[in-house]
């Protein structure tokens, strides 16, 4: 009688397991708090297609660095067509430290997000996570709870210089800040709109998809 639970990226993982055919019968209940259904195509995960650069944090930028691997760009670009065992052996041979360092170096000069969940037709189909959740052939028909927090985005907006001013009344030597909201109405409006948007993409949309797939015990908070 196993219940899986995750928050934020963990909620994303819970939704992924609900869609993954390989996870069938491995758990009996699922809870996702503040999750989301973002998934990336193979090209987006690679970071480049035949026409343009799609994402500086894609695999092509990382694996092309000589500190990570000796693969040529042509080899990396066709990496997804390799046998899965060859892919596994290659990835296992890499240094985790060197991979992370390259990501840290690249992200200083980009606003791109690291591709996380890929529509690779291995776990998540090329249709994407949200459509897979609505697929009755992938339904696990177990009790599912999805939820979000009323002021979800206050965690980020509450420290953003556009909305608040941070004052150190005891000087920075005693780091006890006092936070002053510059425009309370503007701040409240942004928090509500962005938090409602998170609820829509992390609760409402996936629950609608699960209902289409035939789930009978769905709950939201």
Segment roles from a protein language model:
Residues 10-14:
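Catalytic nucleophile loop
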Residues 16, 24, 29, 33-166, ...:
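Substrate-access "cap/lid" subdomains that shape
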Residues 22-25, 215:
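Residue-level recognition of short, well-ordered coil/turn positions
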Residues 161-189:
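A solvent-exposed, charged loop/short amphipathic helix patch at secondary-structure junctions
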Residues 213-221:
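Conserved beta-loop-beta element that borders a ligand/cofactor-binding pocket
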